[in-house]
Structure formats: structure tokens, C-alpha cells
């Protein structure tokens, strides 16, 4: 599955403990990554500064659902459970 352009759920819902340019301590769950632009696109996509955890995340129907809202809800619940 390819990511839905403009979704951004994986850049909002989960906590990320790795440093991110502009967020040296990572980001807490539910906080929008500073690298997510106004169109919900990662400004680091394809760049070496992108955290490994972000690079390694692969979209899948179970997590991402059929809509951006489903993806955000699913990832928020997974974060809550961990």
C-alpha cells in the first residue's frame, strides 16, 4: 500500500523518541511534527535527515484504514495501547 498523500496521521498520532530537525527531543503523541507542512506532507521525505523510525514505517490497510481520519484514530489507539 502506498501512503495517501496529505494524510499525515503517522506524523501526528505516535510519539517519536528520535530527534527530528526542529524537535531535538522527538515529539509526544498527538503533537503534529514540525516537519509536516500545511498540506500534511513530510518536508524530510527522501532526505537523510528524516528519522529512521519514520523511514521504516510502511503504510498498510490495517493501520491506515480507508480514510485519513481512520488512520489517525487507528494510530492514536495503537499509541494508547503501547
Curated annotation (Swiss-Prot):
<comment type="similarity">
    <text>Belongs to the UPF0153 family.</text>
</comment>
<dbReference type="InterPro" id="IPR052572">
    <property type="entry name" value="UPF0153_domain"/>
</dbReference>
<dbReference type="InterPro" id="IPR005358">
    <property type="entry name" value="Puta_zinc/iron-chelating_dom"/>
</dbReference>
<protein>
    <recommendedName>
        <fullName>UPF0153 protein VC_1057</fullName>
    </recommendedName>
</protein>
<dbReference type="Pfam" id="PF03692">
    <property type="entry name" value="CxxCxxCC"/>
</dbReference>
Amino acid at each position: 500500500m502506498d501512503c495517501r498523500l496529505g494524510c499525515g496521521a503517522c506524523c501526528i498520532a505516535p510519539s517519536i523518541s528520535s530527534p527530528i530537525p526542529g524537535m531535538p527531543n522527538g515529539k509526544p503523541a498527538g503533537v503534529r511534527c514540525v516537519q509536516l507542512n500545511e498540506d500534511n506532507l513530510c518536508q524530510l521525505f527522501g532526505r537523510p535527515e528524516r528519522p529512521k523510525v519514520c523511514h521504516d514505517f510502511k503504510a498498510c490497510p490495517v493501520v491506515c484504514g480507508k480514510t485519513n481520519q481512520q488512520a489517525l484514530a487507528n494510530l492514536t489507539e495503537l499509541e494508547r495501547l503501547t
